[in-house]
Curated annotation (Swiss-Prot):
It is found in: Cytoplasm. The keyword Hydrolase applies. It comes from Burkholderia thailandensis (strain ATCC 700388 / DSM 13276 / CCUG 48851 / CIP 106301 / E264). NCBIfam families: maf. Its EC number is 3.6.1.-. Its main location: cytoplasm. The lineage of its organism: Bacteria, Pseudomonadati, Pseudomonadota, Betaproteobacteria, Burkholderiales. It catalyses: N(7)-methyl-GTP + H2O = N(7)-methyl-GMP + diphosphate + H(+). It holds the Pfam family Maf. This is 7-methyl-GTP pyrophosphatase.
Length: 215
């Protein structure tokens, strides 16, 4: 059964990340990108999972407020927080902090909480899930870590390693139920949520190449 695009809810990705955009394009459904403005500072005493879930929901709702859609919108929000030894590892922001993160994590097991939220503006319903990925980092030298950072500048990602790029060379093992979660957009969970929201996955009205056009 072919669906009329004009009657479907608008699919929105609440993220400026090109990696999340590339992942969503795999579903071959049209979507638009809206960059949310959300303070990503963890709350005092907040667990890594709680931080990721709260921010994913906040991003989805912030983007939804900026969207006009006659037939409603399904807004995808996501956030990722890394943790080891009970400490949250966020986005480093600078080369120095990124190097310190990688030095602390080498040879260690680290958990990445990839939170996903699907907000349905038609009814106000929210589906939300935290997909956990366990990663073991290789024991690399300071020279190797510094060279990686200068090559890929991963200062805007939790844990200072882009597994979708050269950062895969920092890792010794990955344990996850969803291979896309570590990149930041768990597609297995997302497709489950979209189906629950009644969005057609196998007869989408247009290819992803027609989407991602901004607001």
């Amino acid at each position: 059964m072919q669906h009329d695009a004009s009657s479907l809810p608008r699919l929105i990705l609440a993220s400026s990340s090109r990696y999340r955009r590339e992942l969503l394009e795999r579903l071959r459904a049209p979507f638009d990108v809206v960059t949310p403005e959300v303070d990503e500072t963890p709350l005092p005493g907040e667990t890594p999972s709680a931080t990721a879930l709260r921010l994913a929901a906040a991003k989805a709702r912030a983007a939804a407020e900026r969207v006009r859609a006659p037939h409603g919108a399904l807004v995808i929000g996501s956030d990722q927080v890394a943790t080891f030894d009970g400490l949250q590892i966020g986005k480093p922001g600078t080369h120095e902090r990124a190097l310190a993160q990688l030095q602390a994590m080498r040879g260690r097991d680290v958990e990445f909480h990839s939170a996903l939220c699907l907000y349905d503006s038609r009814c106000g319903q929210t589906q939300i899930e935290d997909v956990v990925t366990r990663v073991r980092f290789r024991t690399l030298t300071d020279v190797e870590l510094d060279a990686y950072l200068r090559a890929e500048t991963p200062y805007d990602v939790a844990g200072s390693a882009k597994s979708e790029g050269l950062g895969i060379a920092l890792l010794d093992a990955i344990d996850s139920d969803d291979p896309t979660a570590l990149v930041g957009l768990p597609l297995i969970a997302l497709t489950r949520m979209l189906r629950a929201a009644g969005y057609p996955l196998f007869d989408a009205p247009a290819s992803a190449a027609d989407g991602a056009n901004g607001q």
